[in-house]
A protein has these predicted regions:
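Basic/polar N-terminal segments that are highly enriched at the extreme N-terminus
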Residues: 1-6
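Acetyl-CoA-dependent GNAT
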Residues: 8, 15-19, 23-85, 89-90, ...
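Short hydrophobic/aromatic beta-strand or adjacent loop that forms the aromatic wall/cage
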Residues: 49, 161-167
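A short, internal acetyl-CoA/4′-phosphopantetheine-binding micro-motif in the GNAT/acyltransferase core
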Residues: 86-93, 121-123
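Conserved G/P- and acidic residue-centered "switch" motifs that form tight phosphate/ATP-binding loops
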Residues: 96
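Conserved active-site alpha-helix within GNAT-family acetyltransferase domains
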Residues: 99, 123-156, 161
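Conserved GNAT acetyl-CoA-binding A-motif
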Residues: 109-122
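Acyl-donor (CoA/ACP) binding surface of acyl/acetyltransferases
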Residues: 151, 163, 171-173
């Protein structure tokens, strides 16, 4: 089911999307191969993930996925679905697309859970996401910093990259 406004369409990904999506990110110098999106589609068919795509005025603008069983153990143990891989192309930012994608993912999550989870990176590239999640009512899950979904022990040294995250939750039901 697609959410339609005058200029924005949020819909589930389909098999025609992976090449377009990959090309859009490749043009920015980001490595997001079509195989990743094809995996998302396979997981959708298996009932494990919902990949939502945003089109702004008919042009690919971004996407987000909802994983029904999180790779992060505390979410999986509590049956908290996880929103992951929120990406809005830079030319389409600050138009409400990220929030619309989150609205759609949270709405889907609310059909199965009263809580949804999300992870956010720790360095400045994630600054906009950090602010959006706080404004939307997400709070840390209390488990501390994670690296590749594993707790970072006090005194440990890690690389602050895309694998370092703070996990957050929000009521949705």
């Amino acid at each position: 089911m697609a959410l339609v406004t005058v200029q924005l369409v949020i819909r589930l990904m389909d098999e025609s999307d992976p090449e377009t999506m990959s090309a859009a990110f490749t043009a920015l110098g980001w490595h997001k191969p079509p195989e990743m999106y094809q995996r998302y589609l396979a997981e959708q068919e298996e009932g494990r993930r919902l990949p939502f795509l945003a089109e702004w005025r008919g042009e690919f603008a971004g996407y987000v996925t909802l994983q029904w069983v999180s790779d992060y153990r505390p979410f999986a143990e509590r049956q908290i679905p996880e929103i992951s891989d929120l990406n809005v192309l830079p030319p389409h930012r600050r138009q409400g697309i990220g929030n619309a994608l989150l609205d759609r993912a949270e709405s889907a999550a609310s059909a199965r859970s009263k809580v949804v989870g999300i992870g956010v990176g720790l360095y400045s590239d994630y600054g906009a996401a950090q602010r959006i999640y706080v404004r939307r009512g997400y709070l840390p899950d209390g488990q501390g910093i994670m690296y590749r979904n594993q707790p970072v022990e006090p005194g440990a040294t890690i690389t602050i990259d895309d694998e370092a995250a703070l996990m957050l939750t929000r009521p949705v039901g």
